[in-house]
Amino acid sequence: SLIDYHLSTQESFKNLMAHSLDTVRYAAYNTFYSSEAISLRNATDISPTQAAKYLRTLHALDSTNPFIHSIYLLNKSSNTVYTTNAGSSSFDQFDDQSAFSPNNHLLKLRQLPNQVWVYTLQFTGIRDTDASMVVNIDTYLFNRSLFRDTDATEFIYVPEQDTYFSSTGNAYLPIETLN
């Protein structure tokens, strides 16, 4: 029946989305626990040369996944944030400090200061409750890979409501509900 088809399609979409996010999440998890990222997170005195060497690990993750917009890594002892898109800066000068605030949602859609919508994945150490690595996934690229059969250019999936929204321009969402 049509209802069974709709439920099956919806379940397939959820599985595809979960698999796509898991691919990024597992690669980021491995990066988070790599010796280079651990050194970058925990070093009390790190030279620019060492930092550049360790940053290659973050750039490797960024370059192998087309959905990743940016990666931030926080060294709390030196109060430094290292990024793949804007170099490094002190945490106090960092323009996206809220990215390191605890996030209790599976997916949190938020807007970066330069108008890029992202899904944010946060990683913390075992004993640490504050996020120390953030992976921002470009929603447009990610959702475009899932919704290939539509002319829409903007998508939002709200997992708590199991609802998808799309738009064909810069108009306010929701324009069309996809489920």
Feature roles, as predicted:
Residues S1-N42:
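Juxtamembrane extracytoplasmic/periplasmic/luminal helical "stalk" adjacent to the first N-terminal
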Residues D62-R148, A152:
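Extracytoplasmic/periplasmic ligand-binding sensor regions of membrane-associated signaling proteins
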Residues N42-P48, A86-F91, N170:
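Short, flexible/disordered intra-domain loops and linkers
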Residues L7, A51-H59:
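Short amphipathic alpha-helical segments
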Residues G169-N179:
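Extracellular/periplasmic juxtamembrane segments that couple receptor/chemosensory ectodomains to their
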Residues S77-T80, F155-S167:
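Short, glycine-anchored, charge-dense loop/turn motifs used at functional sites
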Residues Y29, Y72, F155-Y157:
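Conserved beta-strand cores of small sensory beta-sandwich domains that regulate signal transduction
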Residues L21, S47-A51:
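Solvent-exposed, acidic/flexible segments
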